[in-house]
Regions:
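Catalytic machinery of carbohydrate-active enzymes
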Residues: 1-176
Length: 176
């Protein structure tokens, strides 16, 4: 079976999607998984993805991977941010994302795979004995008046609680 996991959104959503890719792989362990996304480097070296394609640059994707094989193709493409459980803060976002497709989320966490040369390059910048916790509490387009979005940004009091909780055990990196 061909499995297509299509992600739209920003870098943070793509990083979060690496956890969902683990869920998809758990449900499709022997299937060929294609990730279609805006930030393909997030999925680089991720063994759960057999192929990674950048949005708008996947050419004859339909013809090559789907046409004539529709009955053996599963497509995961939906936005969890539009679900009532997310908007009303009823469940964890990854649980919502998995549940909308009937998949079971069991606490999988995001993971980025780095090569040894990438690790060696960045090592001097992050000399620490603690694990790194990268946090992107807000985002959106720069200088366009979208300074805060309740559907995207973590409220400052929550960010401060997270930082306070992890500052003694992790080196915290703020991603803008």
């Amino acid at each position: 079976m061909t499995v297509i996991f299509h992600i739209e959104g920003g870098l943070g959503k793509h990083i979060m999607a690496t956890a969902l890719l683990k869920v998809i792989k758990k449900h499709h362990p022997k299937d060929n998984i294609h990730v279609v996304c805006a930030y393909p480097d997030v999925f680089k070296h991720n063994t759960a993805a057999d192929h990674v394609h950048q949005n708008g640059q996947h050419g004859a994707f339909y013809k090559q991977y789907i046409k004539g094989k529709e009955s053996k193709t599963k497509i995961y493409f939906a936005d969890p941010y539009t679900q009532s459980d997310f908007i009303l803060e009823q469940k964890h976002l990854l649980s919502i994302w998995a549940n909308q497709w009937g998949l079971k989320y069991e606490g999988e966490t995001p993971q980025i795979y780095l090569t040894q040369s990438e690790i060696d390059y960045f090592k001097p910048f992050y000399q620490t004995d603690k694990p790194i916790l990268a946090i992107q509490p807000n985002g959106g387009p720069q200088n366009q008046g979208f300074n805060y979005s309740w559907t995207r940004d973590i409220p400052e009091p929550v960010v401060l609680k997270v930082v306070e909780e992890f500052k003694s055990t992790h080196s915290i990196v703020h991603i803008k």
